[in-house]
Design a protein with these regions (language model features):
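Amphipathic alpha-helical dimerization/coiled-coil segments
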Residues: 3-26, 34, 56, 114-142
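Short hydrophobic/aromatic-rich motifs at helix boundaries and adjacent loops
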Residues: 23-27, 36-40, 55-56, 91-95, ...
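N-terminal helix-turn-helix DNA-binding core of bacterial DNA-binding proteins
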Residues: 30-79, 106
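Generic recognition of well-ordered alpha-helical segments
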Residues: 41, 70, 82, 118-121, ...
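Generic structural signal for secondary-structure transition and capping sites
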Residues: 51, 63, 92, 125-128
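Canonical helix-turn-helix DNA-binding module
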Residues: 66-98, 102
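Short, intrinsically disordered/low-complexity patches at protein termini
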Residues: 75-78, 88-90, 104, 118-119, ...
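Basic, amphipathic "hinge/linker" alpha-helix immediately C-terminal to the N-terminal HTH DNA-binding motif
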Residues: 99-123
Length: 142
């Protein structure tokens, strides 16, 4: 048995839990896509190979494109540009273009973006734990 609630363009499909005291993980539709839980929806914004490393670095400092690229040597320019654009569109980072020659562009984390840092840290620590369990040794840079 389920109940549908429409709010702000999002259709939530609430299913009655069969186990008492469970935390709701509702199905919902947003922007014509079905999501099966809120974690999947959050992953849309911070998931993938590069979004979390970009947010992590911008949390430490405001960086120009070239500075950010140097800290992520394996990312392709096209991918970095698209990831920055997606993060900016979702309000997690801001882009400031200075009217000078040569042109200067800086990227900074927003307050909304700073909300992701504790989540990223938990995921990072869990990943490190899994790596340790699998015998993967990594030289961590602070």
């Amino acid at each position: 048995m389920s109940e549908q609630i429409k709010t702000n363009g999002v259709t939530l499909i609430l299913k009655k839990a069969s186990v008492k005291n469970t935390i709701a993980m509702p199905d919902f539709i947003f922007d014509h896509k079905m999501y099966y839980n809120p974690a999947e929806f959050a992953w849309k914004y911070i998931g993938g190979t590069w979004k979390m490393p970009i947010l992590w670095r911008l949390n430490k400092a405001t960086l120009r494109y070239s500075e950010l690229k140097k800290t992520l040597p394996h990312i392709k320019h096209k991918v970095l540009s698209s990831q920055l654009k997606e993060l900016e569109e979702s309000g997690l980072i801001s882009k400031k273009i200075y009217a000078e020659v040569p042109p200067k562009t800086e990227y900074a984390i927003t307050e909304k973006g700073k909300e992701t840092i504790p989540v990223i840290e938990i995921i990072r620590n869990y990943g490190l734990k899994l790596m340790e369990e699998k015998g993967i040794n990594v030289n961590l840079k602070k």
